[in-house]
Amino acid sequence: MNTRLEKFYKENVVPALMKEFGYTNPMEVPKLVKVTLNMGVGEAATNKKILENAVADMAKISGQKPVVTKSRVSVASFKIRDGWPIGCKTTLRRAKMYEFLDRLINISLPRVRDFRGVSGRSFDGRGNFNMGVKEQIIFPEIDFDAVDAIRGMDIAITTTAKTDAEAKALLAAFKFPFRN
C-alpha cells in the first residue's frame, strides 16, 4: 500500500535528486526514516487530566497511541519528581509517516496564522530536521471546541541524508515550505 507522498517520492523525488547530486544508484538517494512527535506537558505533574487530553490529542494527530514520557530526575524548581509523567511522544514510520507528512505539508502548515514558511536553519548537521508547532489545533483531526488548552509539539524528521544540503533538497522536493 503506497501512500500519495511515497508514490511521489519514488516517481519524482528520486530521479530529481539523482540528477542534482550525481548519484549513480537509486539506493544512494536520501530517504525519510521516521518522524518523531513529542509533546512536553509540564503541568501534567499536578493534574493527570491534562496529560490524558495531551495523549488523546497526539493519538488523533498521529493515528497511533503515544508513549507517556516520565521525568528522569527530580527538579525542585519545576516541582517534579523522578518518575512523574511529564509528556508524551510517538514515532511514525513507513505509511503513517508519509500520511502525516502529507497532512503536515498540505493542510496543517498553511493553517498556521501569519505563516511565511519554516526556517531552513533547523537542520542538525547530520541531515535531520527539527521544527516546533505552537498550536495543536492546526491539525484537521483536532476539534477546536473540544480542546481544553493550546499545546505545542516538537516534530523531528529523520532522514538517511549525510549532509544538511541533501536533507534540505529532499524535503524541498516534497514541497516542504522553507522560508529561506
UniProtKB/Swiss-Prot annotation:
GO biological process, one term: translation
Transmembrane feature ranges: none
A Gene Ontology molecular function term of the record: structural constituent of ribosome
Pfam families for the chain: Ribosomal_L5, Ribosomal_L5_C
Origin superkingdom: Bacteria
Gene Ontology cellular-component terms listed: ribonucleoprotein complex; ribosome
Quaternary structure and interacting proteins, as annotated: Part of the 50S ribosomal subunit; part of the 5S rRNA/L5/L18/L25 subcomplex. Contacts the 5S rRNA and the P site tRNA. Forms a bridge to the 30S subunit in the 70S ribosome.
HAMAP family: Ribosomal_uL5_B
Task performed by this protein: This is one of the proteins that bind and probably mediate the attachment of the 5S RNA into the large ribosomal subunit, where it forms part of the central protuberance. In the 70S ribosome it contacts protein S13 of the 30S subunit (bridge B1b), connecting the 2 subunits; this bridge is implicated in subunit movement. Contacts the P site tRNA; the 5S rRNA and some of its associated proteins might help stabilize positioning of ribosome-bound tRNAs.
Alphabetized NCBIfam families for the sequence: PRK00010.1
Family to which the UniProt record says this protein belongs: Belongs to the universal ribosomal protein uL5 family.
This protein's name: Large ribosomal subunit protein uL5
Protein source organism: Xanthomonas euvesicatoria pv. vesicatoria (strain 85-10) (Xanthomonas campestris pv. vesicatoria)
